[in-house]
Amino acid sequence: MARHVFLTGPPGVGKTTLIHKASEVLKSSGVPVDGFYTEEVRQGGRRIGFDVVTLSGTRGPLSRVGLEPPPGKRECRVGQYVVDLTSFEQLALPVLRNADCSSGPGQRVCVIDEIGKMELFSQLFIQAVRQTLSTPGTIILGTIPVPKGKPLALVEEIRNRKDVKVFNVTKENRNHLLPDIVTCVQSSRK
């Protein structure tokens, strides 16, 4: 049976919106939920990057157009976006570590939106995701990109795990998937 639930689909199809809605439904039913999501940053009608935002509301840059890497650090770039690894790790890693070491009755849900090219520049993030996948008592509700170009090792690893259910989000089904996603996460908690 699936323990972790991941959404996949093309950019802009509504994966993050579904993650938000599912998190709210789960929280309102008393499920402990923590994690982070990525959000587009726009300026003058143009996308200039992405922020990482924790469910507790802390926000920091994930990537920006034309960002200079810190002196002595290698540049991590996806298209026109330069990834701010330090900022990302400062926000995302504590959330994942909290999911790993949290005790208490019942299963916790850890939101990871997303496990994509930008996030995978961080070796510490890769290790933390693998750790969280194998932590009893933690269910991941996350997003992964659709396969395109060179496969991303961790994404393929997740996609092929027997304890993972992957929902393919499309414009046609996105308005009907929420109950299935919530039910799948809730049944993982039993």
Swiss-Prot record:
Keywords for this protein: Acetylation, ATP-binding, Hydrolase, Nucleotide-binding
Family note: Belongs to the THEP1 NTPase family.
E.C. numbers: 3.6.1.15
Quaternary organization: Monomer.
Gene: NTPCR
SMART domains: AAA
Principal EC category: hydrolase
Binding site residues for ATP: 9-16, 109-116
Record-level Gene Ontology MF annotations: ATP binding; ATP hydrolysis activity; CTPase activity; GTPase activity; ribonucleoside triphosphate phosphatase activity; RNA binding
InterPro entries named in the record: AAA+_ATPase, Nuc-triphosphatase_THEP1, P-loop_NTPase
GO annotations of cellular component type: membrane; mitochondrion
Name of the protein in question: Cancer-related nucleoside-triphosphatase
Record-listed N6-acetyllysine modification sites: 165
Phenotype for residue 116 to H: Reduced activity, especially towards ATP, GTP and TTP
N-acetylalanine sites (modified residues): 2
Known function: Has nucleotide phosphatase activity towards ATP, GTP, CTP, TTP and UTP. Hydrolyzes nucleoside diphosphates with lower efficiency.
Catalysed transformations (reactions): a ribonucleoside 5'-triphosphate + H2O = a ribonucleoside 5'-diphosphate + phosphate + H(+); 5-methyl-UTP + H2O = 5-methyl-UDP + phosphate + H(+); CTP + H2O = CDP + phosphate + H(+); ATP + H2O = ADP + phosphate + H(+)
